[in-house]
Amino acid sequence: MFINNFDPVAIQIFSLELRWYSLSYIVGILLGWFFAKKIFINNESIRSKFDDYISYLIIGIIIGCRIGYVFFYNLNYYINNLIDIFKIWQGGMSFHGGLLGVIIASILFAKKNDQNFFNYLDIVSITAPIGIFFGRIANFINSELYGIETKVPWAVKFTSIDDLYRHPTQLYEAFFEGFVLFIILIYFWKRGFMKAPGLISGLFLIFYSSFRFFIEFLRVPDEQLGYMIFNLTMGQIISVVFLLFGSYLIVTKYENKKKN
């Protein structure tokens, strides 16, 4: 068993703080950017515009993550405290919201440049697990998104929360949604799935949503929401929606791949 008493602040210079969570965003975006340009982009037209696309992507991620959290997880509070929506430093980001932000940013950028937005979304999908991995590690350091009580040998006590030993669900997600998902997508990328725009995106949605859905059974639900319809969490409900959308993409895009 392990005791988690990590400091969420990575670096502090006088009153300026750089937190692990912020650092995870920076590292995830930079590494994703690097691998995308060095390995996964084969189209020169997309490569030449990718740096500009990153600006859209960053804005989409930040706004999407925040608005997603506000809308999906704590709408009643923010309706009565509108100014707090802008206080991102107080916490409250949603991956599913960020995913919607990325999709919208990709559509807007591709439309501006008269390109298929799936060409960009597939690249983001195959590199996203890198950012997810570091993001979940940061969640672990921050003692947030923790699991239910357990007696497994690898249980963790989050001292800033209580004295219970819990499932380190952040590490489960880092492993499955980060490392394992990256390996799966690389497997399909090597088999030419990137040649059919939308297939890699569909696979990402299916596998991410599946991993997230099952790990959520071990995770403490959001305090302000608890369990919802069919005793599922909000994260599980949204994951089902994205799973269905990913399945739709696979069916339609794979048919197009066979025709071509």
Task: Please place each PLM-identified region on the residue numbering.
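A feature for loop-to-transmembrane-helix boundaries and adjacent hydrophobic helices
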Residues: 1-260
